């Protein structure tokens, strides 16, 4: 059995058919009432191109769903910032497995959080974006997944 290899590639260098295949898959996952025909028409790709690439194209974070991810965050040293981050993760059914917080230096605390993502109600990409927008969070980075 041949093992599939994966590459992490910036979306802007991919051919249009592959980018649009990813768009169709995202559209279908967000709007399950759509048919493939309707989705490919909305995105502007042929059905044959979609079917050619659909089994090999998926968002980067999709492969991490149902897995354990590790995030590195820089948090302002203020009361309640870490608590808000943890409550936010819990609100979307992320299961926090470990937390490691270093002593704050220069008003910033480095925090590492491992999260089980299987039951999460948002994508990992959406989680990262939302966390990065939170007051008191200056950096969020996905540093590992297993």
UniProtKB/Swiss-Prot annotation:
Residues 70-145 form the ACT domain. InterPro entries: ACT-like_dom_sf (IPR045865), ACT_dom (IPR002912), UPF0735_ACT_dom-cont (IPR008310). It comes from the Bacteria. Belongs to the UPF0735 family. This is UPF0735 ACT domain-containing protein CHY_1913. It comes from Carboxydothermus hydrogenoformans (strain ATCC BAA-161 / DSM 6008 / Z-2901).
